[in-house]
Amino acid sequence: MDTKDSNSSQALAIDGGAQTRPTDDHASLTKRLTQPRSDRSQSPEGRPPPLPPRPETLILLEDGGAAPGTPRPNVSAVHPGLQSRATTAVSLAEISQNDRGKDALAVRSFPGTVRAKASLSHLATPKDGSDAGDSASVTSYVPYSESGDVENIFGSLASSEVGIAQEESTGLMQFPEFQADDVEDDFASELEPVGEIGEGGENEGTVLAYGSTTAETDQLIDLVLEKWKAKRKHYIILSAAGKPIWTRHGDGGLISTYVGIIQTIISSYEDSNDRLNGFTAGDTKFTVVAKGPLYLVAISRILESDTQLKLQLEALYMQILSTLTLPALTHLFSVRPSTDLKRPLQGSETLLSTLADSFTKGSPSTLLSALECLKIRKSHRQTINNTLLKTKVSKLLYGLVVAGGRLVSVVRPKKHSLHPGDLQLLFNMIFEAEAVKAGGGESWIPVCLPGFNSSGYLYIFFELQAMKNALVEKLEENGSINNIKEAIDKGRPSTTDIVPGSVLHHFVYKSRVNVQFIMSAYDPEFSTITRRRRLISTYNNLHASVHAKHTHVKVHHCVTQSSSSFAWITPVFELYCVAGPHANRNALAQSASKVVQWVQKEEERLFIISGAVF
């Protein structure tokens, strides 16, 4: 692939846990820390006394935060320069007491006030200090240890039974409960078409919006509207002038009235020099993202936070840019603010819909802002990498081997890598675009990757087709194609394959360094779309709470009537797991620790560490 700017013919190239231990005399320590360096050098003490020895284990989250009989140090004097006060508060009870007031409610109220740090527009490029909250927390990193130590570290995260609220004493997260959890509902119908209201409109033969008489027409329109209102989730894109551009359900005729209301509400805030980010009405959440001349709106009755909905809207915006590029989009609306964008986007509606449906069904990739890799032997992946390097051509910018929606290998320039959000767009195009399917897997349409360069297109030249053919031939000769097929057929590992007798039903592990994740098999507990959606909602809750702005402790545990869930965040990884509602807390913690140890052992099979670099 090569890339060219849309306004220029010039070719482009892609391119631990610090602790502060209080001494017996805080005043003396403060004096030594604040006096000038020259004065300290003249001190008769010569140098500050050594810190007290580090305890062998941390008994976190028990009442009082310390072992029985251990005197509690005075933590009232905290150095103002520290990133976090969690260095002296080693229990959720302590933190809750210290933060009681303006911060306590902010930490525990979901989903209105919790905020995650992730953004699709800055994937894999965290700002300096973005992990300060992790590195400054006592519980942000726990070395791999034996199961006996795990009980001390995690054992008292939750000491209450299901349904008993002991939020202040144990740190249990009070998440909303699912409705009708033990029965299958009609969630599968969420993705079915509702019909259209247009001249002779018909959506895949589902509903005709016009009858032979006025009464029949009104009846059909009412039926379409009822189906539209019954949907749990909507995505609507409109222009700043109030013109409908795209909606996941229905058509412009169906949503025109609602678009007018949305545009009026947003404009009223803008007239007051304010910006509307979202609001909640009953159990329905409205999230708004303004991108230049476009407004993107998500309306959801599914358990998701504002930040998660915002990430989804940003991904839809990137999908639009992949078709038009940012300069083209800006030019269209600068010339004519009332531009109808439906025609320029014609043909890409399917990509928008499939991307939106993946969010509705539940997308771990979007939630974690990471990519899933195919588990394969290290030697097999290295063979594929070497084959990519041997067959590459001079104009190659980036190459991918993808199987079953999971990344197998990449070939890339040294010190350059593609944006994970861009790779998600590529995956969506490869596996969902009708043009690619009709072309037997080939597409010559230029595509913009906004995370890399929102101003230009990537082009596929003829010589790259020759490279693809040569690569496939070599992969078949050395047996790599069969190795990939076997890895796909083997499927994701089950929790009991990794930890025999584990109480875990499912887990997701993200490598923060590699911006990649792996997860266990959905079967048998989450084999239906409804149960899978509830699983992702549980992960949504955990992710939002553990990444909340005022959260200090990075180990969270939640018990509801349907499940026990657990999150463990360190500077190295993020682990989210789910078990049954009556799972023993120590067994849950031990299983989580063993999963981390398994990932550490299998890391080069689970993740692409460097890929094929040239």
Curated annotation (Swiss-Prot):
GO biological process entries: autophagy; protein targeting to vacuole; vesicle-mediated transport
Top-rank taxon, per record: Eukaryota
Ranges annotated as biased composition (Pro residues): 46-55
Biased composition (Polar residues): 1-11
Keywords linked to the UniProt accession: Autophagy, Endosome, Membrane, Protein transport, Transport, Vacuole
Chain spans, region Disordered: 1-81
Pfam entry (one): Fuz_longin_1
Membrane topology (UniProt): Peripheral membrane protein
Keyword match Isomerase: no
Subcellular location: Endosome, Multivesicular body membrane; Prevacuolar compartment membrane; Vacuole membrane
Family: Belongs to the MON1/SAND family.
Annotated PANTHER family: SAND PROTEIN-RELATED, VACUOLAR FUSION PROTEIN MON1 HOMOLOG
Its job: In complex with CCZ1, is required for multiple vacuole delivery pathways including the cytoplasm to vacuole transport (Cvt), autophagy, pexophagy and endocytosis. The MON1-CCZ1 complex acts at the fusion of vesicles with the vacuole, through its regulation of the SNARE complex during the coordinated priming and docking stages of fusion, and particularly at the stage of tethering/docking.
The protein's name in its UniProt record: Vacuolar fusion protein mon1
Organismal lineage: Eukaryota, Fungi, Dikarya, Ascomycota, Pezizomycotina
